[in-house]
Amino acid sequence: MSERRIHYSQLKNDNLNQISPSSAPSPITLNHQLTDSSSSSSSGGNNRISPIILFIIVLLSVIFFICSILHLLVRYYLKKKRSNLSSSPNESNQNPEFSDSDTYQRQLQQLFHLHDSGLDQALIDALPVFLYKEIKGTKEPFDCAVCLCEFSEDDKLRLLPNCSHAFHIDCIDTWLLSNSTCPLCRGTLFSLGHQFEYPDFNFGFFAGDDGGGGVRVSPVQKPAENEIGKRVFSVRLGKFRSSNIVNNGEVVVGGGGETSSSSLDNRRCFSMGSYQYIVAESDLVVALCPNNEGLKNNKDVEGKKINMRSKGESFSVSKIWQWSNKRSKFPNNHPSETNLVVGGSSSSSSYVCSGSDGLSLNGRRFQGP
């Protein structure tokens, strides 16, 4: 028994010697180990990517790819379109006759299909021009229907061949810059199915129905003409006279101290308040040289001058009547009391005028500045 006790005590001492204070873990060391283990576990959880974030990244990548494809397609389409446009002038140069015809047609359609768009200055300059003293026929004083002034021998007139009305060149040029019809009868410069040739141009214009209710104007070849010969145009001029309209339809006309009673034809009577513009019945003609030789822009022409205005403006009739002119046929009336209305049916050319400071034509009002 004593030996066993001694052996047990020796073993116990040996075990105590093996366990030293330095080898035993301290509380601080244990706390550090616990902290490291918790941090490693949390970092491992954060390294995992959420499925929602992954889906958003993939979706944005797909959208970016599709946008890039569309951008490339658009650039390719625009580049191809530019190449086609650049090649079209070369094709038109190969067919000059076809291209010129299309160009004239587009320009004329733009001029005549727009509502009161006016005419181009080149087209206005192509209308016949002559001096008042060159008119052959019964010579009597006539007045310009635009500026209301009497023509003098050296006045330069421009003729509208379709209706044969003539006006001072400055008056009608200003009017045609903002209107495409005659200021007196409101007739168009081109008739349907009528071939009209300008003296200044080497080609004429043919006006016809385009099938859609509009007017189609296309260039036509001008026939050969003798350079020495002159072309004869009919001219329709008139004069202003004061008038009093009676209930029975008779018109008492007075002008220059004369008074007469007659039933005036509506086709040549243009009423302007207490005055009427009466177109003469005499056959007036004028012979014009080709290309209006000798009548190119001459600034020394006598007569009433109207300043050229910007395109889109028109006359104010009441303000034009305020001009002082010793040759005028009118007494000194108040312009504000003078009415001017122009209207008419298709069967007759009767025109009546109203408006104190503007011009009303066929139900449309043209206000002056």
Curated annotation (Swiss-Prot):
GO terms for molecular function: transferase activity; zinc ion binding. GO terms for cellular component: membrane. One of its GO terms (biological process) is protein ubiquitination. It is a single-pass membrane protein. The chain crosses the membrane at residues 52-72. The keyword Transmembrane applies. Residues 341-355 have a biased composition (Low complexity). Its EC number is 2.3.2.27. This is RING-H2 finger protein ATL47. The lineage of its organism: Eukaryota, Viridiplantae, Streptophyta, Embryophyta, Tracheophyta.
